[in-house]
Amino acid sequence: MESRYCSHAYPAIPGDLQMKIGPYTLHAIETGRFALDGGAMFGVVPKPLWEKTNPPDEKNRIAMAARALLLVGEGRRILIDAGNGSKYNEKLTAIYKFDTTHSDLHRSLKSLAIAPDDITDVILTHLHFDHAGGATISENGTIVPAFPKARYYVQHDHWLAAHAPTERDRASFFPDDYEPLKIFKQLEFTNGEETILPGISVRVVNGHTTALQCPVISDGTTTLFYCADLLPMTSHVTLPWIMAYDLRPLVTLEEKRKILDLATEEKWILFFEHDPGTAAARVKRTEKGIVLDSPVML
């Protein structure tokens, strides 16, 4: 598919040793840390099992990354997800332990000599606050898109779901994170599985939330699958380790099975948005099932 928008000529950014897939150089972007309840993150899995790999704090919360992915190439700067952002009040900060002491989205981009105006495209996997919070910022008391020249891509069915949430998932959606994208005419809807930009397509899953889109970056030889909340952490590679947050956990189970089978057979790289220690890895099949294999540096 041809690019929907004209290319811009940008100079190369640091990172000669960074991974490349097709025309794109890939950079894992740390946007900050936060914490969620360990029981909610692992559903029916007993605490004595999950606390071995994800030790909780005194409030039973486990450490979480909010990791985005930057693609640079074809005259574009493409960001996948945007982390929590920085618009939250003291109450939410205390609940979720938001921490940008060591990194935030804009400092991480600045370290690569990228300004907000340089971002051409933002693919939002879904609109939960820990993925879309950084899509907007507060500027002189007004909430505006964080990247003023970017197109923001959201699945249309997910947009509808975010505007009609259930009591179960209502707390995950904050309109300030996404309504300005429409107001400022920077929003573009995707519809199912399609190619968004050259070498970048999306797969749609429905277990965690309705119409979550997982970007797939491929050049026919190397493929990276952006897991989002289908596989938020490396611990979730184990099939029954499924979040209690998921609206349809049995759907998640089958979606995980399908993706992990493909990732094993085709040696995909899996990108983990929330794992505090591992940004990306491959998986392999063993007698005990599919397990984590070698980490991949991004």
Q: Across the structure, where does each feature detected by a protein language model lie?
A:
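Cap/insert and terminal regions of metallo-dependent hydrolase folds
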Residues: Y96-R107, S218-L298
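Conserved beta-strand hairpin/beta-sheet module of binuclear metal-dependent hydrolase folds
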Residues: K20-S111, C214-D229
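Residue-level marker for buried hydrophobic side chains located in beta-strands
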Residues: I78-I80, I123, Y152, L224-Y226, ...
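Active-site metal-binding loops of divalent metal-dependent hydrolases
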Residues: T31-G32, A82-G85, L127, D157-H158, ...
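Metallo-beta-lactamase
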Residues: T100-I114, D118-D130, A146-V204, T209, ...
